[in-house]
Design a protein with these regions (language model features):
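Alpha-helical transmembrane bundles and membrane-interface segments of multipass inner-membrane proteins
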Residues: 1-152
């Protein structure tokens, strides 16, 4: 049951943060937090992570919906299994983050990002993220680690 609620929780939490970013952050405004290591700023991303495919919003939207459908099906197939908690967690985080970003893209034509980091390589410093991006990343990292372990 929790595995079907977690994607909804991610979706709602990030939706609230995106709304707050839209309402309270001005264009080009940067608010440093955590001793300047993290920066809050509003960015409208019409493409995928890093801004790729910005001119193909509808294609990205369709592909995302298709992939999310497959992930939901996989999560449903694991529903009754007790030993697959880590796999279910990875799927639930990925689905929740994907749903939130898909919804933004579907309703607005862009995804609202609001967090940057002031450390690491310059390319990394230029990227802007949202909570859904982190959930997708950690969910996919967990699923990859499980897959690597199972293939041994």
């Amino acid at each position: 049951m929790i595995w079907t609620l977690l994607p909804g929780a991610v979706f709602l939490a990030d939706g609230c943060l995106k709304k707050k970013a839209e309402e309270e952050l001005k264009e080009n405004e940067q608010i440093p937090v955590c001793k300047g290591h993290i920066v809050l700023r509003k960015c409208h991303n019409r493409g995928v992570a890093g801004g790729g495919f910005a001119d193909s919003t509808k294609k990205v939207e369709f592909l995302t919906f298709f992939l999310l459908s497959g992930l939901w099906a996989r999560l449903g197939a694991l529903a009754g299994r007790r030993k697959c908690k880590a796999k279910k967690l990875g799927l639930a985080l990925t689905i929740g983050g994907g749903m939130s970003n898909w919804y933004d893209r579907h309703k607005r034509g862009y995804v609202t990002d609001y967090v940057s980091f002031r450390f690491g390589p310059e390319k990394f410093r230029r990227l802007v993220f949202n909570v859904s991006d982190f959930c997708i990343f950690f969910g996919l990292a967990l699923l990859t680690a499980i897959s690597c372990r199972e293939s041994r």
